[in-house]
Amino acid sequence: ANDVEVSLLTLSGEGGSYTLTSSAVDVTSATAFSVTLNAADQLAAHGLLNKNGTASSGATTYNVAAAENWMTGSPASVTVADLTGNGITVSNVQTPTITSATYDSNTGILVVTGTGLFKKTGANNDIDISTLTLTGGTANATYTLTSSSDIEITSSTSFSVTLSGADKTAVDALLDQTGTTSSGGSTYNLAAADNWLGAADAATDISDASNSITVSTNPRITSATYDAASGALTVTGANLQANGGGADTDASKFTFTADGSSTY
């Protein structure tokens, strides 16, 4: 397959342009060829060609430009570059959705799973994280992320947000135990307001209100003090969580090591 050098084709649409990286293909006739885009090309193309028809949501007319030598068998003496006037008609644009999320309070990483995600031209602008609201804590308390740093998707089905500072503190308080419900009995939820995916058609409401969150974390012990007079052992750690029903810790799992490496 080498009739058409696909890497010399550039798509133009919403917010800019993108040069394909998919493999070369053969023509199917004297008047046509087709390309099945690789995964990276699809993510970019879907962001540019984000609305059915011949123009993007921002009214940019779709175009495919072919740089010189795109038709590999043409004579070197003939200029075959074809840069303008090559419209693209788009169909079957899918509405992006969120389906679920997981949160690790050790790392602060929120991994969101969805369908039909695609990239926006530029860097760190695929997902507007200020549109994401988490529910948990007591009486279904909510918190909307405040970080000004937007992020890129990792694939057509997922993206991840690393929380820090005030965002992590607030989210840890809401998602305060492992599983899908808080110690206060609230079901964890992730809601995304409209326009959460930057490249989506602005005229289409893509808000997504109900998506479960599953919390996982590894509690850590950092130090301990012991009062010999009272027999009180006070343990300090991180990510300690309420059980939600029954004892929070199992003291039989603790082992003490003393001088001489003796243990109890």
Q: Which residue stretches match the model-derived regions?
A:
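Non-catalytic beta-sheet/beta-sandwich ligand-binding modules that flank or precede catalytic cores
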Residues: A1-Y264
